[in-house]
Regions:
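Metal-associated gating/positioning segment near the N- to mid-region
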Residues: 1-54
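Histidine/acidic-residue-rich, glycine-tolerant segments that coordinate divalent metal ions
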Residues: 37-49, 53-125
Length: 125
């Protein structure tokens, strides 16, 4: 289940605790949190913090990594380091990767690690 728990940074909307209890009440046992938090989930430290705080929640909380640093579509995150930190996939959720070469490189890196990459491609025009 794709979720936006908004933790860290936007916990006035939702957080790990309230989101996990709501998911459990709805019968969901596992959720995948998106990376559009503050800070963005684009470093191993951020992902490790989230997963550590999720350890004692009533459901399984998984975390995706951003594809690009800062969701800027210019520099890829360190895919291997993010997987090692616990990422279950990659996405710049809600922000299209407009450079085809950059997107292709991201897909190659994700495939080499046998990890999914989820794209939200659209022309904002």
């Amino acid at each position: 289940m794709h979720v936006h728990f908004r933790d860290p940074g936007f916990t006035y909307k939702e957080d790990l605790e309230t989101g996990s209890h709501a998911a459990a009440a709805g019968g969901f046992t596992t959720v995948v949190c998106m990376a559009n938090t503050k800070p963005i989930v684009d470093t191993p430290e951020v992902i490790q913090d989230i997963l550590k705080r999720a350890e004692n929640l009533p459901i399984h909380v998984k975390q995706v990594s951003a594809v690009s640093k800062g969701f800027e579509g210019k520099e890829l995150v360190d895919f291997q380091a993010m997987v090692d930190a616990g990422a279950c996939g990659f996405t710049d959720d809600g922000i299209p990767l407009l450079n085809a070469t950059f997107c292709y490189e991201a897909m190659q890196k994700a495939a080499a690690l046998h990890m999914p990459i989820s794209l939200h491609e659209e022309d904002k025009a």
